[in-house]
């Protein structure tokens, strides 16, 4: 006997007031931002970084990073937008690339810390864990938009029904790569919280290095499962960038361990 399996797909629109639509995608990003900022302001005093400095940085970096993430995505997906230029501005439909946001945010952070006479690595060490938790939450925006998913699989019975149903796309269950990356970032955040409380364990800049290696490794593996990777000359751009992050992070640790004058992170 044939049976019809019922599936409940979630509406990507959370609130609709006339022409105004607020999407879950935006809510997830904002929730990640708010929690990340809160955690950074709590940790900042350990490096003598004022709350006002963190808030001022976010007010500048967040909109520019979203813009950078969109430009990055459009640049590598130009064929989707060249015939409808106005769709470039429809960012609420999804289509931002984390690496574009990270690159833009890093540039803004460098100039901001130089202008405020703040040690750049100290600021990075405070911000990096917050970025991880923000990414962990923000990835759920992809869940609601049914994007950034993986290859087709026979079943997802190991997942709760609400995730399983949402990952039924184009007639097949899809690997929930958004979930893999969310959990990976959450685990990385937890490890950082433990490691930075150990006396004389992490040196200045090594929390940043940990983020680069941890996120780079996770993204390198997870990106290989996705079906919507941004490509350039037949290459998955994010995997190459992940390799660069890993290499930079390892070099940072090696160089800093060779210098006894570099201070340890104070728990």
Curated annotation (Swiss-Prot):
One of its GO terms (cellular component) is plasma membrane. The keyword Transmembrane applies. Its main location: membrane. Pathway: Protein modification; lipoprotein biosynthesis (diacylglyceryl transfer). It is a multi-pass membrane protein. The chain crosses the membrane at residues 20-40, 57-77, 88-108, 117-137, 175-195, 205-225, 235-255. It is found in: Cell membrane. It comes from the Bacteria. One of its GO terms (molecular function) is phosphatidylglycerol-prolipoprotein diacylglyceryl transferase activity. The keyword Transcription does not apply. Keywords: Cell membrane, Membrane, Transferase, Transmembrane, Transmembrane helix. A 1,2-diacyl-sn-glycero-3-phospho-(1'-sn-glycerol) binds at residue 139. InterPro entries: Lgt. It holds the Pfam family LGT. HAMAP family: Lgt. NCBIfam families: lgt. Catalyzes the transfer of the diacylglyceryl group from phosphatidylglycerol to the sulfhydryl group of the N-terminal cysteine of a prolipoprotein, the first step in the formation of mature lipoproteins. This is Phosphatidylglycerol--prolipoprotein diacylglyceryl transferase. The gene is lgt.
């Amino acid at each position: 006997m044939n049976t019809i399996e019922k599936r409940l797909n979630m509406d990507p629109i959370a609130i609709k007031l006339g022409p105004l639509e607020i999407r879950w995608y935006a809510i997830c990003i904002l929730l990640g931002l708010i929690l990340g900022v809160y955690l950074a302001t709590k940790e900042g005093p350990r490096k003598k970084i004022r709350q006002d400095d963190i808030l001022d940085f976010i007010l500048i970096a967040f909109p520019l990073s979203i813009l950078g993430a969109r430009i990055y995505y459009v640049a590598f997906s130009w064929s989707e937008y060249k015939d409808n230029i106005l769709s470039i501005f429809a960012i609420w439909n999804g289509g931002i690339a984390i690496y574009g946001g990270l690159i833009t945010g890093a540039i803004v952070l460098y100039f901001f810390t130089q202008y405020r006479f703040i040690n750049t690595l100290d600021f990075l060490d405070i911000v990096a864990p917050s970025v991880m938790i923000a990414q962990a939450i923000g990835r759920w925006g992809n869940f609601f938009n049914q994007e950034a998913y993986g290859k087709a699989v026979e079943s997802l019975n190991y997942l709760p029904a609400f995730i399983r149903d949402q990952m039924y796309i184009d007639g097949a269950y899809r690997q929930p790569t958004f979930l893999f990356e969310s959990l990976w970032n959450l685990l990385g955040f937890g490890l950082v919280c433990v490691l930075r409380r150990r006396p004389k364990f992490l040196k200045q800049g090594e929390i940043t290095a940990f983020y680069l290696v941890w996120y780079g490794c996770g993204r390198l593996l997870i990106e290989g499962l996705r079906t919507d990777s941004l490509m350039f000359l037949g290459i998955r751009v994010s995997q190459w960038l992940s390799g660069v992050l890993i290499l930079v992070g390892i070099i940072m640790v090696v160089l800093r361990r060779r210098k006894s004058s570099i201070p340890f992170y104070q728990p």
